[in-house]
């Protein structure tokens, strides 16, 4: 059963400000397992791996609060539907008085091959309506991090909207499950290291992984 968010504010620590990891997706069983909901999946997998229960509800989001290696972390899955994600993320970040350099958004990305991840310090919305809403509620500010999860491009002339709301094929699901495990490592890296060489090396490894997979499939 979900409980209300406690008034406890992790921002009282003068040593560590909390990180907010925000996964984008659509609420309801209808959308579970679809490409557009991989942000939700990443938050759930990470929460389970670090022992944070997603049993809080506030700011139009299902949430969890806890610590990872003594670092405060807030996890959230907006329940507003994708295109209105900012209605949750904006008030949530404001409540905790979080600077945007302590916010990371996890989202699907059609510009990356299926199962390939990329950490990004900041950037635009790339025509992703969920990101667009988040940015609008951050007053147009784009200075927040992202974990982009590649879902590949729709085949042929397939409508991108239909592609996003479709579930993964079995081979794609296997790649995505491996990617989610790697995503846990990526989020732990974010907590341990500021943007810099370690993030760049992670992205290089992800690019090499894709090239290696492509070579095997082409052989």
Swiss-Prot record:
GO terms for cellular component: mitochondrion; ribonucleoprotein complex. GO terms for biological process: mRNA processing; RNA splicing. The keyword Endoplasmic reticulum does not apply. Residues 1-10 form a transit peptide. It catalyses: an N-acyl-L-alpha-aminoacyl-tRNA + H2O = an N-acyl-L-amino acid + a tRNA + H(+). It is an enzyme of class 3 (hydrolase). This is Peptidyl-tRNA hydrolase, mitochondrial. The lineage of its organism: Eukaryota, Viridiplantae, Streptophyta, Embryophyta, Tracheophyta.
């Amino acid at each position: 059963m979900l409980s209300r968010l406690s008034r406890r504010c992790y921002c009282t620590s003068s040593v560590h400000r909390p990180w907010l990891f925000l996964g984008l997706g659509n609420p309801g069983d209808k959308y579970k397992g679809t490409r557009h909901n991989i942000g939700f999946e990443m938050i759930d997998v990470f929460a389970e791996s670090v022992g944070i229960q997603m049993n809080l509800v506030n700011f139009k989001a299902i949430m969890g609060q806890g610590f990872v290696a003594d670092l405060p972390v807030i996890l959230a899955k907006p329940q507003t539907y994708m295109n209105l994600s900012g209605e949750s993320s904006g008030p949530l970040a404001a409540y905790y008085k979080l600077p945007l350099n302590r916010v990371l958004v996890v989202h699907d990305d059609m510009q990356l091959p299926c199962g390939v991840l990329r950490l990004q310090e900041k950037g635009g919305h790339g025509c992703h309506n969920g990101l667009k809403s988040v940015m609008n509620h951050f007053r147009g500010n784009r200075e927040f991090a992202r974990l982009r999860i590649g879902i590949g491009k729709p085949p042929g002339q397939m409508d991108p909207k239909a592609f996003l709301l479709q579930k993964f094929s079995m081979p794609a699901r296997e790649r995505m499950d491996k990617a989610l495990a790697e995503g846990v490592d990526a989020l732990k890296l974010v907590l341990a290291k500021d943007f810099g060489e370690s993030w760049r090396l992670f992205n290089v490894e992800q690019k090499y992984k894709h090239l290696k997979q492509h070579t095997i499939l082409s052989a």
